[in-house]
Amino acid sequence: MTLYLDGETLTIEDIKSFLQQQSKIEIIDDALERVKKSRAVVERIIENEETVYGITTGFGLFSDVRIDPTQYNELQVNLIRSHACGLGEPFSKEVALVMMILRLNTLLKGHSGATLELVRQLQFFINERIIPIIPQQGSLGASGDLAPLSHLALALIGEGKVLYRGEEKDSDDVLRELNRQPLNLQAKEGLALINGTQAMTAQGVISYIEAEDLGYQSEWIAALTHQSLNGIIDAYRHDVHSVRNFQEQINVAARMRDWLEGSTLTTRQAEIRVQDAYTLRCIPQIHGASFQVFNYVKQQLEFEMNAANDNPLIFEEANETFVISGGNFHGQPIAFALDHLKLGVSELANVSERRLERLVNPQLNGDLPAFLSPEPGLQSGAMIMQYAAASLVSENKTLAHPASVDSITSSANQEDHVSMGTTAARHGYQIIENARRVLAIECVIALQAAELKGVEGLSPKTRRKYEEFRSIVPSITHDRQFHKDIEAVAQYLKQSIYQTTACH
């Protein structure tokens, strides 16, 4: 598959397919023409010795300092070197790859003044899978993701570290190996590379993809739990959900009915009890609300993926050219969205932990043994798996605190309000990793509970899931190191996302 970039129409589904199929990037001719036109404006500014921020002046507090024309290119290299102050563990290779795609896409809008050489260098790095090593910490989320994107830019000019064919190498060595020259930054290009929200947005895209997948995975896991507890299926009837109007809730209820169709373990209202606890009865309402959040996040991310968030921006209208210093680099819209994503995923984990508690609690699990122990007393069974899940959801409650309500001044109070969007992105992904493990714990426990109930009673669809995951997690016949089971399921759930055939 080839992903065609035009600066206007990139979607998250495009990114997902690109990652699944190890695709290449091609650029639409019209987009290249826009790049040429915006670059011509920069060249005219230089020729006419105009005063324009970041082209003929310094940056931030130094915006009033005029730069000698012989030092315009040096200014851009100095910018990249000085701003590469990222700290901590690097972003994943998927996030770094998406970051390059998003930065390339915004340059193709033709408002940044980049050269074709810069555009082609980004395309080369993407297609050859030369992945810049980009530390996660150090961004305030306005003026964009300066520190992370500076590390990306370092790789392009042959000064940074990269991951290439599974090995960490100097960018310059990889370029030499591939007979490719480092990029020679021209006026405006350093700024064009780092003034933007691509770090938070790239992490947000990966987080959205994995969060949405977790939402779907949580449904069949919940269906296993539901059957193991002889849950009441009436609560999922279409007429119940249609009168509330939330389409996502209606959709979850329909999928739950589909997962449970043909089960002999489900019950009807008043057959065993009149109604179930909320964690079973309200799955469509709770999970559906998370999908509402995911849909909002997707919309915001796709707006930003196709946005011009550089500064200054170059415009041409009716044969008139003008360059405007604005603030499209400010990450507030994405920061809000990613804080919402944290809430949506946290709730999937919260309700999962409460469901698995019902499976192991002898006061709540019907006729199942306490903690599903094969020999209660001598063997503890799933007792501490519930502890682990409780620990993860409690950690999520701390991580879910909104990063976007925080701000701190920088650059001598010139940049006096920031979004903290990249912090929201980082914390959000940790919540996703935690939630995936909570769902993995529910899966391990629900598999055992279903076995004790009798797998012949499972619906055909959940029976297939049972068989699929029993190949990863064997029956619990005695106490063992359950962390291995949990991690095996969590990794299997994650790996399925980037395969062309999804697991759910």
Curated annotation (Swiss-Prot):
Could you tell me which pathway this protein works in?
Answer: Amino-acid degradation; L-histidine degradation into L-glutamate; N-formimidoyl-L-glutamate from L-histidine: step 1/3
Keyword Acetylation assigned to the entry: answer is no
Can you locate the 5-imidazolinone (Ala-Gly) cross-link? 142-144
Molecular function (GO) terms for this protein are: histidine ammonia-lyase activity
Q: Which reaction does it catalyse?
A: L-histidine = trans-urocanate + NH4(+)
One Gene Ontology cellular component term attached to this UniProt record is: cytoplasm
Location, primary (coarse class)? cytoplasm
Which enzyme class, named as a word?
lyase
User: Entry's InterPro entries?
Assistant: Aromatic_Lyase, Fumarase/histidase_N, HutH, L-Aspartase-like, Phe/His_NH3-lyase_AS
Cysteines joined through disulfide linkages: none
Question: What are the alphabetically sorted keywords of the record?
Answer: Cytoplasm, Histidine metabolism, Lyase
Q: Which PROSITE patterns match?
A: PAL_HISTIDASE
Show the PANTHER family listed in the entry: HISTIDINE AMMONIA-LYASE (PTHR10362)
Q: Which family does it belong to?
A: Belongs to the PAL/histidase family.
Q: What's this protein's name? A: Histidine ammonia-lyase
Q: What is the lineage of its organism?
A: Bacteria, Bacillati, Bacillota, Bacilli, Bacillales
